[in-house]
């Protein structure tokens, strides 16, 4: 099923789409499940919806969050947690993405939690990525590619990246300081190249550079649920 992407959105449209996606995804959660909680605005809506079910239905589940922000929100809603060091497998992981191409390859990490998000996806028996139609692209690269880098030797890592043609900037906070991930690392946002027709090749190349912790490409089996401004949700999966 294919749809045309809408060209005009309001903030109300965005909120409605995210809430609808979250409600449909949270309906899949069953008692006893171990649930992976992603990061970002769409994942936030899922956490809110899950917290409502936990409160209203006394739904007995446990969770692992991919970021401190998601953890604190879920904790405030009364969602119980697993020890992330001991959770080998999750029944369901729900997250968002910054871009998704026609082959369901993605760029993630706009919120700076890409390393932990990818660990949860690796652990998930079923992975669902929730996006609105704006996130669909023909080729990845419109959104800057986040790379998580160790502070130790970060300048030399940047030099190697630049030599290989990956040009960008260190992510900064609103106060102008370097953004630090929950793992204590930096994020380097690559803006050039601005097109990745073969992200698998770039991923392999980048992970060979010492000092790079992880890269924002996600090339993994996942369902992608796309919400449209007319209220429909299309579920995509590469089989």
Swiss-Prot record:
UniProt KW keywords: Isomerase
Annotated positions binding substrate: 39-42, 95-98, 108-111, 135
InterPro entries: NagB/RpiA_transferase-like, Ribose5P_isomerase_typA_subgr, Ribose5P_isomerase_type_A
Catalytic activity: aldehydo-D-ribose 5-phosphate = D-ribulose 5-phosphate
Gene Ontology terms: cellular component: cytosol
Pathway where this protein functions: Carbohydrate degradation; pentose phosphate pathway; D-ribose 5-phosphate from D-ribulose 5-phosphate (non-oxidative stage): step 1/1
One record GO biological process: pentose-phosphate shunt, non-oxidative branch
EC number: 5.3.1.6
Active-site annotation: 117 (proton acceptor)
Pfam family, one: Rib_5-P_isom_A
Molecular function GO terms recorded: ribose-5-phosphate isomerase activity
The family this protein is said to belong to: Belongs to the ribose 5-phosphate isomerase family.
Role: Catalyzes the reversible conversion of ribose-5-phosphate to ribulose 5-phosphate.
Self-association and partners: Homodimer.
Protein's recorded name: Ribose-5-phosphate isomerase A
